[in-house]
């Protein structure tokens, strides 16, 4: 067997394998014999078709099958011997039987060779959130909204109120357009942007007022729309007082006292924003390393991440895109993002290799112990059995390895903590 490896690019190679008849003929003869036993040709008993006729009829398909099997057999051995690191399935580009030899040409993508930059000089800022009483109050207010009551208000509409009115579309002269009236339309001012023309027109108005609203086109050359709103009612969300009885109801008897409930809210907020702080830091780290290592990405790897992003988007809309949605266009639009994912995978694999990182069963046990502290209803043994199962083990190993990779990076870069206020949210 002879082999010739040609570098096509940083991420692509071609392999030429030349086999002697002694190396491929046994497989060819076996395929021919199996075909002779099964092929039916009119005028001949099954299994008694002359070999010459059989070669003329199905010879090309046998040659293709033999080339496929020989390529698979020898590529695996050559890849191990030459330390080839394929990034895609090998494809047969051509094969040729001539002068007692079988020549097979194979193409495939490889992981690129590159050097990691010294990232010890990199600096990152990590948000450090401190939960204040005001943050707890704001979170509790959001919870109480689910237990509030909408009541009619005589006051002028303010942020957070709901305005109910009849809406009529107007023509360019300000006259009602027949059939355009929409009765009892609800405007929840809280969820309208501050610059929304309806919110701007309705805030400060009371029941009985009539307001005209002009909605200008977002794009040049678009149509300007005009509406008249006859306000019939302003409703305000009245929140209940937080007391021990309501705490029992809200927490489903987990807590009996307001103080205990508030403390739990504080702990939840602290855990949430600690996770957010860590997530944002890791995102900043990966973005920096991707930027500093413009590594070429194998197309098969990029396509893999494009498919993942496509399936994730599909799950977010219930498992099926709406009718008329162009999946191919979306797939192509995901390519830049997929390239970043592929590049980060190559970089993180390089870090793991250079630092001899691996995941042991002891690592998985330690991970189970840590997770059990977060979920008291599950024991370490229960989690460990799940993590070591066929369905979950690869995922858990990948998760732990990622943690180790980031730990290596964090140990070498400079991370500065920065006091950061908790962002308001609705």
From Swiss-Prot:
EC number: 5.2.1.8
Annotated PPIase FKBP-type domain residues: 160-240
Subcellular location as annotated: Cytoplasm
Keywords: Cell cycle, Cell division, Chaperone, Cytoplasm, Isomerase, Rotamase
Pfam family, one: Trigger_N
GO molecular function, one term: peptidyl-prolyl cis-trans isomerase activity
A GO CC annotation given for this chain: cytoplasm
Entry's Gene Ontology BP terms: 'de novo' cotranslational protein folding; cell division; chaperone-mediated protein folding; protein transport; protein unfolding
Catalytic activity: [protein]-peptidylproline (omega=180) = [protein]-peptidylproline (omega=0)
NCBIfam families documented for this protein: tig
Similarity comment: Belongs to the FKBP-type PPIase family. Tig subfamily.
Comment text on domains: Consists of 3 domains; the N-terminus binds the ribosome, the middle domain has PPIase activity, while the C-terminus has intrinsic chaperone activity on its own.
Function in brief: Involved in protein export. Acts as a chaperone by maintaining the newly synthesized protein in an open conformation. Functions as a peptidyl-prolyl cis-trans isomerase.
Name of the protein in question: Trigger factor
Native source organism of the sequence: Chlorobaculum tepidum (strain ATCC 49652 / DSM 12025 / NBRC 103806 / TLS)
Gene, per the UniProt record: tig
């Amino acid at each position: 067997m002879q082999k010739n490896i040609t570098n096509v690019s940083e991420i692509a190679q071609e392999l030429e394998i030349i086999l002697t008849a002694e190396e491929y003929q046994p497989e060819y003869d076996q395929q021919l014999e199996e075909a002779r036993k099964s092929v039916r040709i009119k005028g001949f008993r099954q299994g008694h078709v002359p070999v010459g006729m059989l070669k003329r009829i199905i010879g090309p398909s046998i040659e293709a099958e033999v080339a496929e099997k020989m390529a698979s057999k020898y590529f695996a051995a050559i890849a191990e011997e030459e330390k080839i690191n394929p990034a895609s399935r090998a494809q047969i580009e051509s094969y040729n039987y001539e002068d007692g030899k079988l020549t097979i040409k194979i193409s495939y993508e490889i992981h690129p060779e590159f050097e990691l930059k010294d990232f010890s000089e990199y600096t990152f800022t990590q948000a450090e959130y401190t939960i204040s009483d005001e943050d707890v109050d704001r979170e509790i207010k959001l919870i109480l909204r689910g237990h509030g009551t909408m009541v009619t208000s005589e006051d002028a509409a303010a942020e957070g109120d709901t305005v109910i009115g009849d809406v009529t579309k107007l023509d360019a002269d300000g006259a009602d357009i027949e059939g355009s009236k929409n009765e009892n339309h609800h405007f929840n001012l809280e969820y309208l942007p501050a610059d929304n023309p309806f919110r701007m027109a309705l805030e400060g108005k009371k029941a009985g007022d009539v307001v005209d609203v002009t909605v200008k086109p977002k794009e040049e050359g678009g149509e300007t729309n005009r509406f008249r709103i006859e306000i019939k009612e302003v409703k305000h969300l009245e929140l209940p007082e937080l007391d021990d009885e309501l705490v029992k109801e809200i927490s489903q008897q987990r807590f009996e006292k307001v103080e205990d409930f508030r403390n739990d809210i504080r702990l939840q907020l602290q855990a949430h924003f600690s996770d957010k702080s860590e997530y944002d830091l890791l995102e900043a780290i990966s973005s920096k390393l991707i930027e500093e290592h413009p590594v070429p990405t194998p197309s098969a790897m990029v396509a893999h991440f494009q498919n993942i992003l496509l399936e994730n988007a599909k799950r977010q809309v219930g498992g099926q895109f709406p009718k008329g949605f162009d999946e191919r266009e979306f797939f192509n639009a995901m390519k830049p993002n997929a390239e970043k994912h592929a590049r980060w995978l190559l970089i993180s694999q390089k870090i793991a290799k250079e630092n001899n990182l691996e995941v042991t069963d002891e690592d998985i046990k330690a991970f189970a112990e840590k997770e059990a502290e977060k979920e008291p209803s599950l024991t370490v043994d229960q989690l460990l059995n799940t993590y070591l199962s066929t369905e979950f083990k690869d995922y858990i190993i990948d998760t732990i390895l990622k943690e180790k990779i980031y730990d290596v990076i964090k140990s070498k870069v400079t991370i500065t903590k920065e006091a950061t206020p908790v962002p308001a949210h609705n």
